[in-house]
Amino acid sequence: MNRSLALFIVSIALWCASAYGQATSRDNAALVLDTLGVWRIHETLKPPVIQLDDGLKPIQSTYDWLDRETAPAPADWTSPGFADGNWLRGGARAASRTPYLANLCLRARFEVTDPAQVKDLNLSLTYYGGAIVYVNGQELVRGHLAKEGAPAMAEAYPPEAFVADDGKMLPAPNWLMEKYPKGLAARARTLANVAIPAKLLRKGVNVLAIEIVRSPYHKILDEKKNQAADKKELATRNCPYDLSWNTCELRRVQLTAAGTEGLVSNASRPKELQAWNSDILTPDYTSDFGDRCETPRPVELKGPGNGYISGKIVVGSPKAIEGLKVTCGDLKQGDAVIPAANVRVRYAVPFGHTASNSDAYGNNAAELDSLLETPLASFPATPAGKGAVVPIWLTLKAPKDAKPGLYTGQVTIEARGEKALTVPVRVEIAGFSVPDTQDYRTWVELMQSPDTLAIEYNVPLWSERHWAMIADSMRYMGEIGSRVVHIPLIAQTNSGNEQSMVRFIKKPDGTYDYDFSIMDKYLDSAEKCMGRPKFTAFIAWEIYLNTPKQEVKFTGKQDVPNHDFDREGAWLAARWELRGKGPAVTAIDPATGKLSTINLPRFEDPAARAIWKPLFDQLHQRMARRGLEQTMVLGMASDVWPNKEER
């Protein structure tokens, strides 16, 4: 690696660490709270504002819904006793990054055991816009704002924050901005080493609250409207201004002390197994940990009778979590009991090996977004989170005749070498029941993919293990009311099926017989696991049969912004190569069982009818025996239709 490149990479790494607080605090200081710690977040959204010569002007978008304002935080949000459990939970950088963010409110907790022993408690933050800091409800400091009151707007930025010395718009705030140190310096605002006096502290839980207030956009954006450093971004913009960076954003925050005397750090996970609450709509990451100052609340599940109702609790440890066992007891309301057997426990793990480099969650943090029915023998610790994290999902199948009201119970969490944790569970059953899943009025149509399962889990197509996975996936689809079964009669469609579900057997006289064994077993599984289908879609046509009117050669050139190559050209060229060929199907040799792919005559060829009509006659008979003949339809997973001759 040459020296200049090495220095460039090091400079980028140091900038990232200082910008987002992922690495260090003050020399020899104890880190009490950090950017990647546990924060509660509230956002107020409004249209962005530009400062013109005649005053402030809201920047309206082309979408009315985008301009709707959201509610401000409650007036007492800075007080220590404010209930923030319903606010977004995450690192300080998990907040929305948008020009529409008008006010950003954040709360974090830390424990003080003896205020008199706390030494050199200091706060530093970097932000865009203006900032007000509160400790236990008392204002500590503010920056780039009016000295008093609750300002709606922070100090304006100079032109250098928006345009380079050559008059061109600056790029979005990513690593490209390293080329523009003047612009970076103009944007970043800081409150550095602000001392927190002991008189603001109290024994027990203390609350640090931060409000970030937006600044207006400079009038130079009006002079440069319909211009952008990123031309691709300009093509997708819904307003004439380049709003490529946000004037209301917290970039970095650290609370440090001279040592740990008199307080307990809340910037990293504790040494023991820990549990914390997480909303089911909030993603969980391997870097997450719980708030030491917050006792886990009950896991709450709310929903109707006969419905599937979920909640979750997350556990974490600085080491691998081994022998994880979760036991849910019966749920009771007086004499009414919902048995524990109605509760399914699942365990979230990363899907594949993807990791995030987002500064919101820490480098290489992975989202825990795939559910396992049984726990791993060992949930490994990861470098990103310096430990292991396991979200535990509780899903209740509420009885159809469940008595409405509040049921209570508890879940016990055990792990090898750890003290067992007990978390209360509260289930609120509404005064109505939903229909069975196949009677939902909401139309749900998911396409089950046998080939995806075979490839993802490396199992042979149509093996017993494969059929078990198909049954599981159909069971999941049935639980949300999916009601369409797709039967590909042709192979190699853009839905990903390598084979057709009906095998074609060529007879000595040139006609065909058909092997329905795969289709029959697939329909058996669908009826058993998903429910009676409302439609059975037989797929007999595919986009590769649509031949371009003239020869197309793949150039490899870019056709659409943000595309890496000429995708449309690649598709058309591939279809040109298949010109004259009919639909691909899977053929089977009845003597050997060997499979092969053959092309039948095109549908506009009269010979095709002699092959397909007998097939559909038999399909009608077989579906009639199942009582499903009225569900039969022709289907296509394509935006392109067959031509008149093919129909």
Indicate residue ranges for each PLM-predicted region:
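Bacterial N-terminal signal peptides
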Residues: 6-17
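Accessory carbohydrate-binding/adhesion or oligomerization-edge regions at the termini
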Residues: 22-97, 109-113, 119-154, 181-265, ...
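Short, surface-exposed loop/turn segments at beta-strand-coil junctions that are enriched for proline
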Residues: 113, 199, 318, 397-404
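Contiguous beta-strand segments within globular domains
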Residues: 120-122, 294-319, 391
